[in-house]
Amino acid sequence: MPDPYAWLQNSLLTIHRADWYRSVQAIQGRAGASVVLGGQEVINFASNDYLGLAGDERLIAAAVAATQEFGTGSTGSRLLSGHRELHGQLEKAIASWKQTEDALVFSSGYLANIGAIAALVGKRDLILSDQYNHSSLKNGAILSGATVREYSHCQVGELKTQLLEQRQNYRRCLILTDSVFSMDGDLCPLPDLLDLAEEFSCMLLVDEAHATGVMGETGAGCVEHFGCTGRQLIQIGTLSKALGSLGGYVTGSHNLIDYLRNRAPSWIYTTGLSPADTAAALAAINIAQQEPQHRMQLWHNVNYLRELLQKIPNLKLLPSASPILCFQLSSPSEALQVGKQLKQAGIFAPAIRPPTVPTSRIRISLMATHKASHIEKLVAVLQGLN
């Protein structure tokens, strides 16, 4: 009989030949702007720790205190033995920050997207999704069983055409978009999307994963940045990027959150977020709101790097309005080579390749804790490669 697992080796060979193969690299020590990777100290431009809070002593102290009081795990589903007062405090803090009625915390942002989408739509419904949306939005759409149609990246006119042609054929319609697109750094046209959602009686779900803590006057995200606070929509985000912890959230109306508590499978049938992660996220939200200097320093770094990168000839810098700056390369092999050369020079900014993105690139993420000297070294190395 043939080996039923033999195809795995052939698939891996195909991945290798396409220069799509991926493997993990262990970071040693605490998260920060400078880390040790494979025994080499490198400047870290690969992290989503935008405010530099993952190594903040206050988050660590909050996590330790919660572990000492409540133990290491939540021990069960939130609907059974896994709910702690800390979870409720975190949900209230998120809802207050976002100026919504209620919030629900999941064990990850990925689970928040999959669970919310699966609960909101089904076989009789339509999903319209930006083609560059995160994998969690795309997979959530597929798993929901709804009819899924993509529209070209940020093309509101094309989305409207699809709504005109198809909306009347379905019970419900859910529009899905990232607010900050994680592999490009650009922003969705949120006010226009909200206008279309209202015009065609659609739900709008916006993933604020890379905007939470970063965008808007108080760091509440792109909804705040665009002046759309208070308008009817579904906001999803993560606690694992600018907030330096782990977990995801959904925030919106009381009815929405109450419904998800009863219908979102990835919340109902999984263990609640650990006390340590919950307490760390709660501490991070307080810091993000009370200490705007972290966000101000982040944006100072973003603007400084963008200004310097624009002076490098032939660097194909992609449009961005966030701490994510990318420059495009011709092929996966070139991206891998540039990423390797950067690492040899003490810069950690790995290659991003298909199928994650349509075109290969180097993705640079800024942090509030980057120093001017870090940014200047990155630019000097890129100039040398160019």
Swiss-Prot record:
One MF term in the entry's GO annotations: pyridoxal phosphate binding
N6-(pyridoxal phosphate)lysine sites (modified residues): K241
Amino-acid positions noted as binding pyridoxal 5'-phosphate in the UniProt annotation, renumbered to this chain: G109, Y110, S182, D207, E208, A209, H210, T238, L239, S240, K241
Pathway(s) where this gene product acts: Cofactor biosynthesis; biotin biosynthesis
Disulphide connectivity of cysteines: none
Keyword set includes Transferase: yes
GO BP of this protein: biotin biosynthetic process
Keywords tagged on the record: Biotin biosynthesis, Pyridoxal phosphate, Transferase
Coiled coil: none
Gene3D superfamilies, sorted: Aspartate Aminotransferase, domain 1 (3.90.1150.10), Type I PLP-dependent aspartate aminotransferase-like (Major domain) (3.40.640.10)
Cross-referenced Pfam families: Aminotran_1_2
Cofactor(s), names only, from the UniProt record: pyridoxal 5'-phosphate
Residues at which substrate binds: R22, H134, T356
Enzyme class label: transferase
Keyword Transferase among UniProt keywords: yes
Reaction(s) the record says it catalyses: 6-carboxyhexanoyl-[ACP] + L-alanine + H(+) = (8S)-8-amino-7-oxononanoate + holo-[ACP] + CO2
Entry EC number(s): 2.3.1.47
Role description: Catalyzes the decarboxylative condensation of pimeloyl-[acyl-carrier protein] and L-alanine to produce 8-amino-7-oxononanoate (AON), [acyl-carrier protein], and carbon dioxide.
Family: Belongs to the class-II pyridoxal-phosphate-dependent aminotransferase family. BioF subfamily.
Binding partners and assembly: Homodimer.
Protein name from the UniProt record: Putative 8-amino-7-oxononanoate synthase
Encoding gene (name): bioF
